[in-house]
């Protein structure tokens, strides 16, 4: 529905019609349009970043980041306006369920980035310290990812170079 008619087409009545059920049936699951939209946003995030069967891209930080940026570009093409519209709409306080769902999805992405950083055998032994942890670097990578989403810039080149210089190369 979103891909064909856009975000504005999503409401309780249109979802009920598309599913061939009564409006009341939809209200059994969602109390409001905001709650419905929160579930839709969460579903789209999961579809965009669904973990592939080939796990090899999660063994290496650079390969993982390249995959994430490819998926961001895919998401932008499949769901035009998703990244900007949902970010603006769900940061409003009255949409706390949508905000909670978005934060849960973002936390999942952050956790996966941390796992990849901890598994990556190519990372120098001294790359992380007590002050500069894998979690800290995952936060930086995630911030760069969000910035790229808002700018619709899906070229990971600069981020991959930052990773290479920060984690893999020995400083002189």
Role assignments for model-derived ranges:
Residues 11, 49, 81-86, 125-129:
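Short, hydrophobic secondary-structure boundary micro-motifs
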Residues 30, 86-94, 147:
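Short helix-capping/turn signature of helix-turn-helix
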Residues 85-86, 141-145, 163:
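Short alpha-helical scaffolding segments that buttress acidic/His motifs in well-ordered protein cores
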Residues 1-35, 39:
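Helix-turn-helix
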Residues 62-88, 150-154, 172:
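Helical hydrophobic small-molecule/effector-binding pocket
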Residues 77-81, 85, 94-123, 132-135, ...:
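Amphipathic alpha-helical packing segments from all-alpha helical-bundle domains
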Residues 42-49:
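Short, basic, alpha-helical segments at the C-terminal edge of helix-turn-helix-like DNA-binding modules
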Residues 39, 53-78, 134-138, 160:
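Hydrophobic alpha-helical connector segments
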């Amino acid at each position: 529905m979103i891909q064909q008619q856009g975000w504005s087409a999503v409401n309780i009545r249109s979802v009920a019609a598309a599913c061939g059920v009564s409006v009341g049936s939809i209200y059994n699951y969602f109390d409001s349009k905001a709650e419905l939209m929160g579930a839709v946003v969460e579903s789209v995030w999961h579809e965009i970043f669904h973990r592939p069967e080939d796990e090899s891209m999660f063994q290496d930080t650079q390969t993982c980041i390249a995959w994430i940026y490819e998926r961001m570009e895919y998401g932008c093409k499949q769901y035009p306006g998703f990244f900007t519209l949902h970010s603006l709409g769900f940061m409003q306080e009255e949409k706390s369920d949508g905000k909670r769902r978005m934060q849960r999805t973002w936390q999942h992405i952050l956790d996966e980035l941390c796992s990849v950083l901890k598994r990556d055998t190519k990372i120098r032994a001294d790359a992380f310290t007590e002050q500069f942890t894998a979690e800290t670097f995952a936060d930086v990578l995630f911030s760069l990812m969000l910035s790229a989403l808002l700018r619709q810039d899906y070229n990971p080149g600069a981020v991959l170079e930052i990773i290479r210089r920060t984690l893999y190369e020995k400083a002189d």
